Amino acid sequence: MADLLSSLKNLSSSSGVYQYFDKNRQLLYIGKAKNLKKRIKSYFSVRNNEITPNPRTSLRVQMMVKQIAFLETILVENEQDALILENSLIKQLKPKYNILLRDDKTYPYIYMDFSIDFPIPLITRKILKQPGVKYFGPFTSGAKDILDSLYELLPLVQKKNCIKDKKACMFYQIERCKAPCEDKITKEEYLKIAKECLEMIENKDRLIKELELKMERLSSNLRFEEALIYRDRIAKIQKIAPFTCMDLAKLYDLDIFAFYGGNNKAVLVKMFMRGGKIISSAFEKIHSLNGFDTDEAMKQAIINHYQSHLPLMPEQILLSACSNETLKELQEFISHQYSKKIALSIPKKGDKLALIEIAMKNAQEIFSQEKTSNEDRILEEARSLFNLECVPYRVEIFDTSHHSNSQCVGGMVVYENNAFQKDSYRRYHLKGSNEYDQMSELLTRRALDFAKEPPPNLWVIDGGRAQLNIALEILKSSGSFVEVIAISKEKRDSKAYRSKGGAKDIIHTISHTFKLLPSDKRLQWVQKLRDESHRYAINFHRSTKLKNMKQIALLKEKGIGEASVKKLLDYFGSFEAIEKASDQEKNAVLKKRK
């Protein structure tokens, strides 16, 4: 405590970020302050050189303060910089007592640029600061389905670079385009099609009706497989905004954020209203080991969503709840980011309160559906058996694959909300000369990406104690808190043997080795994770090998033999680099004379 007491006596009054650590130097909490000295001292009560929690703080905070042994601060220029740095560090380091919201992606918009002669609908996540550009969104899902439908229903220019080619393509032949590239349609005639496209984007009911007519025509012509594609697309578009029945007389442009939860779980609902209609919505389930703090969660949700400059900002942002201090901080953050004032408020009456109540009702409904399933029970049991500090709600699983140390690759699969999240899978080309170096490279590259993609609760490594120790060293150097287990495959590893429940794999943790019965659900859960990562890595290895074989065949056609190919690969590192190299460079490597 002497170190902590000394730190408390020498605090700066500047703006900055503070970090609390326990006696083992494990990160407990990250916060920010306009005045570090004032904020940090508010956590503690110091009498006769004895430090105790401030009794005016919440029980959750008092529990954390009792564990604090060290603190560190980072000074910045102003409160806005502190707010952004705090959010970035929380996502990268995942402290024990901070709430981590993962959904920080920028949602896509559909836009049309009417400053060009033949405008087409496109998807963007970035701002195009120029006149004549019309945006629609944001879309939390279904934007691509809308776009595909528009191109199939209307004779639009099908590709961005079509006009430059000055020659009609196959889309003209199949009557999907009017060939403005060959002046077969005037600008004025095409503009009517573009305006019809706008109407379909603005009125999803009309778009769905056109899709239904197309589906019926296909069914009538016995083209059932194509009709099924339209059926599925209609279903996706219908789900885009489950609240579209809401239509306010006032043409509000609003973003709505509502939290519902308690203890260690909560649900965030986001709704986006444009022109008085809810056009899209999304939700996120949040799990926290050490209690749920609405104020902290709301702050992180707003910063995550608005940190990237968005094309269409609302007139007002409605929040279900937060403190006056946080509301003021967020107001200043938004004004600073967008150089204009956009009001943030917690509605107390009228239409806007009704919108918050609808968002809260939906959050409550999603929360109530979170009943304990068999999978949830297995997660709890795994946490207890493997002595994990928190329930592994999000897991990343790693495996490598190679053939005689060639075509070395690695794969990462992600398991969250009791399902594999294939959009989050990642593939890596590796350079390591053995399985340990390859795993080290794979895990290091993932750890270096923590700032962009926050770390999970748990890493599962395909390997033994050696691979486990590699992972622990990498995580220690990254400063992030992620728990790790490893599973080593039994030598007898046939699929038939495993399917009969005969596998006796071993699970390694920091302090124990577990040899569980094949019928143990906790073992089967870890095996399921490992087998998916193995499948993913193997498939990537096969596709890489096939691609390399094709590249070798192409080089052979150019008169370069296998031995020469190996020399070139050793020097340039990849087939892509070989292709880019000049003949002079390749000849120098092969020591050929002109």
Curated annotation (Swiss-Prot):
This is UvrABC system protein C. Keywords: Cytoplasm, DNA damage, DNA excision, DNA repair, Excision nuclease, SOS response. Interacts with UvrB in an incision complex. GO terms for biological process: nucleotide-excision repair; SOS response. It is found in: Cytoplasm. One of its GO terms (cellular component) is excinuclease repair complex. Belongs to the UvrC family.
